[in-house]
Amino acid sequence: KAVATRQNILVAGGTGTGKTTLTNALLAEVARTTDRIVLIEDTRELQCTSPNLIAMRTKDGVATLSDLVRSALRLRPDRIPIGEVRGAEALDLIKAWGTGHPGGIGTIHAGSGMGALRRMEQLIQEAVVTVPRALIAETIDIVAVLVRDGHGRRLAELVRVDGLDPRGEYSLTSQGDI
């Protein structure tokens, strides 16, 4: 439902938890739409079979993830999925998702829904001193958290980001028992 309603989804978890696998499953749903997709990543991991796909990859000394996010905006994208968010490009990404390009998907290393939002803050601080918490809260709709434990890989937490509470903290709502 989140893909169909063009919500921005952040897939979080540690190494080997299945972030890329879940993101590829979500991209398979995106591929069923007629949306123009500009897929951005460092390493070719994501797979999208959409006929309306433009895939962009970083190149050392030539194009960073931030460069590609900004370039993607010139390509009239409907959706901007990104491989792994790991640096200052987090700011460019939430700006892009929040200014007419909803329906994005991205991955991040974090162990909880709140942790994923706080990690976004840390990454954004690589670009600016003051973190735009309201923009993060307005832009990221869903956080899916994956874990790998004795039972294998699984979805441990699925939360909706409702905005900021009166104290300025993120307000999250669990999306059911997992």
Language model features: what each stretch is:
Residues 167-178:
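C-terminal regions of RecA-like/P-loop NTPase motor modules
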Residues 16:
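Walker A (P-loop) phosphate-binding loop of P-loop NTPases
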Residues 1-6:
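Phosphate-binding P-loop
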Residues 24, 28-71, 116-120:
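P-loop NTPase switch/communication element
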Residues 43, 48, 72-164:
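Conserved P-loop NTPase nucleotide-binding/switch module
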